Amino acid sequence: MSNTIDKAWEFFFEGKVLEAKQLLEKEYQVETCLDYAGLNLFAYLYIEEENFDKALLACQRYVQLARKEQNAEQEHIGLHQLAMVYRSQGDFKKALELIEEEAMLLATDFSEDKLKWSVNDYEQGYLRLQLGELESALHFMKRSLENALMTDDLIAQACAYRGLGEIYATSRITDLAEQTFMKSITAFEEANDDIGVEEVRELMTTYRII
């Protein structure tokens, strides 16, 4: 990663989106960038601006670069990011197709990586929830939690519990929704993620799980 990209990421994490974009564009253009971290940052910056065409371009070039280099690690990341752009646009069906494509790659190259599977299963569950497929959403979200609990990644665990809470709340199984939302809050607190805690509390208010 170049110093420019490194510094641009710092700006982005500090919430200085405009500064991050201005710095990145001094040296790179999304149409020609051949740096994974740069393309990834372009995608985040364009999503922030709701410039989805450019965000899609950044992620598509990321996947193309990974495939050209036969880099399975970067390819699965690129597919996941591409799905996130479609998710941000509300195109849950296309996002799910890409997450399923990522799952096939994981099965081939990362079959024992519990964290990667947890993240993929979470998206499969979340997207199916958005598509109204509650039964399959629950299946994948439970699997996400199972995989997350085999790691020491508290954020993955917190996200899976939160996802289960949303599915149970949507299904009006309020006791299980409250239990899983509270477990999510506990995991986010252990990870010192105050934003994550607040997001779950907001969900509980939205679903009237109080």
State each model region's role:
Residues S2-Q29, L45-E48:
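Alpha-helical segment of the N-proximal tetratricopeptide repeat
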Residues K21, E25-Q29, V63-R67, E100-F110, ...:
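Amphipathic alpha-helical segments of tetratricopeptide repeats
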Residues C33, E73, D113-L115, I155, ...:
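Residue signature of alpha-solenoid helical repeat architecture, marking inter-repeat boundaries
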Residues S2, A37, I77, W117-V119, ...:
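Residue register of alpha-helical TPR repeats
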Residues D6, L41, Q74, Q81, ...:
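"A position-specific structural signal for the A-helix of alpha-solenoid helical repeats
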